[in-house]
Amino acid sequence: MARPQVTITPTRVKSGDSVYVAATSFTPNRTAMSHLVRPDGTEYNPLRFRTNDRGEFFHRIDSTMLDIGTFQVWVEDEATNVNSDRVQFTVER
């Protein structure tokens, strides 16, 4: 099985725009825990998503309430306890 992957599109947004998260190569029809870390290094409460029958889930992040700066995202496959790599996106004024 391939290592879980997370892709962020786009990687730079103006405050108020959306960021799209695509998670692939997770265990199908199970749960994954998505982590979002603020620019100051503190983490929001993780969000649990259910993967589809291909081991994928997709999520939109609304940047309206996010701070200006660079955020990190990674996702844990709860069935295997394997983490994706960390990916980043930046919110600009």
Functional labels for PLM-detected ranges:
Residues 1-93:
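Extracytoplasmic/secretory-pathway segments with low complexity and glycosylation-like composition
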